[in-house]
Amino acid sequence: MPKSRRSKVLTLAQTEKKGHEGKAALFSGVQQSLDSFDYMWIFDVTNMRNTYLKRIRDDWKGSRIFMGKTKVMAKALGHTPEEEHAENVSKLTKLLHGAVGLLFTNSKPDEVIGYFESFVQNDFARAGAVAPFTHVIPAGPVYSRAGQIPVEDDILLTHTLEPQVRQLGMPTVLKNGVVTLLADFPLCTEGQQLDSRQTRLLKLFGITAAEFKVGLLGYYSKKGASVEFLQSAPGADEAME
């Protein structure tokens, strides 16, 4: 008879210890990287996807990327000139809020900017995302791409999906085995939040409505202890004060 496996029970003290160790590792990792690399960048992420972030990490293996508790990262850099870990680096800490991270690298700024400007990935939207466009599926036979491409380049939606799209809100019927939309159907509207029903339909029709991209907010250069804010960085005006 096989031995029964007892489930591990983590005590509150163990959980708190692991949390403290994680924060300490992040804190020291940020400070050590600031000492070791020529540049530190602050970046934000739109439509976070771990798959694409992993690809970025792989592309920048000689560098270090941190994404974690922003308060810990800010504390590691220092909030004021008196407590900053390196001269002038505290000027960047006001940018550390939201979905942001740190990139430590020896690569020149032009190389970093060029890489991230070109690294844009289209993906399926998740519930809560804002629709970047308006799309209406036209009445009549429903095609697999829902009007995204010319019908002569498309194929009819398989009849087995009719119950599913109808359940998701599309007014459809089967006519001679063809999924048919009884009226124009507004799938999404630009500027409005998407719900789970809409995101499921978008994915079913192969329509990507999310864009993963990394925005560079500013960087610190060890040479000359200089700080540069990118024009698009939110909060840069406040940080420069």
Swiss-Prot record:
Keyword Cytoplasm (UniProt): yes
One Pfam assignment: Ribosomal_L10
Subcellular location: Nucleus, Nucleolus; Cytoplasm
Disulfides per UniProt: none
Swiss-Prot/TrEMBL keywords: Cytoplasm, Nucleus, Ribosome biogenesis
InterPro entries, sorted: Mrt4, Ribosomal_uL10, Ribosomal_uL10-like_insert, Ribosomal_uL10-like_insert_sf, Ribosomal_uL10-like_sf, Ribosome_Assembly_uL10
GO annotation, biological process: assembly of large subunit precursor of preribosome; cytosolic large ribosomal subunit assembly; nuclear-transcribed mRNA catabolic process; ribosomal large subunit biogenesis; rRNA processing
Regions that span the bilayer: none
Chief localization: nucleus
Gene Ontology cellular component terms for the protein in this record: cytoplasm; nucleolus; nucleus; preribosome; preribosome, large subunit precursor
Known partners and oligomeric status: Associates with the pre-60S ribosomal particle.
Job of this protein: Component of the ribosome assembly machinery. Nuclear paralog of the ribosomal protein P0, it binds pre-60S subunits at an early stage of assembly in the nucleolus, and is replaced by P0 in cytoplasmic pre-60S subunits and mature 80S ribosomes.
Similarity remark: Belongs to the universal ribosomal protein uL10 family.
Protein's name in the database: Ribosome assembly factor mrt4
UniProt source species: Schizosaccharomyces pombe (strain 972 / ATCC 24843) (Fission yeast)
Gene of this entry: mrt4
